[in-house]
Amino acid sequence: MPHKITVEVEGELTDDSWVVDFGALKEIARSICQELHHKFLLQRDSKVLQMDEGMSNWKVRFLERGWVFPKSEVLPLPIDNTTAERLAEYIGGRIGDALKDCGATNVSAITVGVEEMPGQTGWWRSR
């Protein structure tokens, strides 16, 4: 994923006087981004694409056009569009889940920005 992401967390300070350990947060974010990197991000919840998952490939159709992608190069995501905003929402949700799994129950908000190019960033904030 060649996009730049920004992650902000808010919450109560721990006994160590931080909201989260930045090292752990960076590792979580990097791991998620690595999963997305060099993959065709398929918007599984699209209202305009028709998709068929085969044994070795994905067939995607839009109106009269169609494409076939090897499964090894596709990452199906539970989003309706691969906009920066939806990718930020997906990444933010994954970060939130991972932080909870690490015991960071003090986090009250997560904000994620996905920058497609300088000055063009889509934002998502947890509620």
Show the residue positions of the predicted features:
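Charge-rich, low-complexity N-terminal segments
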Residues: M1-R127
